Amino acid sequence: MAEHLASIFGTEKDRVNCPFYFKIGACRHGDRCSRLHNRPTISPTLLLSNMYQRPDMITPGVDAQGQPLDPRKIQEHFEDFFEDLFEELGKFGEIESLNICDNLADHMIGNVYVQFKEEDQAAAALQALQGRFYSGRPIIADFSPVTDFREATCRQYEENNCNRGGYCNFMHVKLVSRELRRKLFGRYRRSYRRGSRSRSRSRSISPRNKRDNDRRDPSHREFSHRDRDREFYRHGSGKRSSERSERQERDGSRGRRQASPKRGGSPGGGREGSEERRARIEQWNREREEKEEGGA
């Protein structure tokens, strides 16, 4: 029974705990939800509720006076906010991800999720944010149960085909430019490189770990799933690709041991066919029989 309850915890089958709060840290029913919202007492992730106020939040693409807004100005406004927030929160420790929702529903609009490397860093930031204001509005911060943003983000939105629009109950993460992301998160990579010079063994982030971070954290992503899949299949990833490369190396080394200039393979230099192999083996057998008969 305990194993069954553990397996369905935080899923739609769980009739006790709210799956949306467990995955996203927010629920459209709020305190009126019929299921439990288990608020963590400690977490590496903080939720700053409704903190980002987009200039076109009343009507998308139009300001409060009804004038159309240039999309570039909207993005510039967002990136200024993103950088301000990153610089302030970065004082408390290393930030692994900073995600800002582009949703329009009341329980999601402007939500900011900041994930620190350590829980005590998040606790220090939470304490410092108590009673603080931003742009004349109080900052409402609390620990969030979200630690894996793959379960919280909307995959259809990342592929530009979410039919629920801004009122989707999964996170529509607004992305920053590559230059700003490199500027802010690149400082951690530089510190890793500096630290690795003083140690005999480098502890810098490997390409595989970087791919894992990109999948886990949407703020490190600036292209769609289709683009990412192209990169995935181009470079290979995971256990299958490693097994495939090992098998190819093994086959290649075996082929080098067996091949000789006199008895080369197929004319095209490629892998021999089964008929060619059989013909070559029959030729070897005939040569061996002729030698044995001659010796007799």
From Swiss-Prot:
It comes from Arabidopsis thaliana (Mouse-ear cress). It is found in: Nucleus speckle. One of its GO terms (biological process) is photoperiodism, flowering. Residues 191-202 have a biased composition (Basic residues). Residues 209-254, 272-296 have a biased composition (Basic and acidic residues). Residues 191-296 are annotated as: Disordered. Its main location: nucleus. GO terms for cellular component: nuclear speck; nucleus; spliceosomal complex; U2AF complex. A zinc finger (C3H1-type) spans 12-40, 148-175. It comes from the Eukaryota. Necessary for the splicing of pre-mRNA. Probably active at the 3' splice sites. Component of the spliceosome. Homo- and heterodimer. Interacts with U2AF35B, RNU1 and SR45. InterPro entries: Nucleotide-bd_a/b_plait_sf, RBD_domain_sf, RRM_dom, RRM_dom_euk, U2AF_small, Znf_CCCH. Belongs to the splicing factor SR family. GO terms for molecular function: DNA binding; RNA binding; zinc ion binding. Gene3D superfamilies: 3.30.70.330. This is Splicing factor U2af small subunit A. Keywords: DNA-binding, Metal-binding, mRNA processing, mRNA splicing, Nucleus, Repeat, RNA-binding, Spliceosome, Zinc, Zinc-finger. Residues 44-146 form the RRM domain.
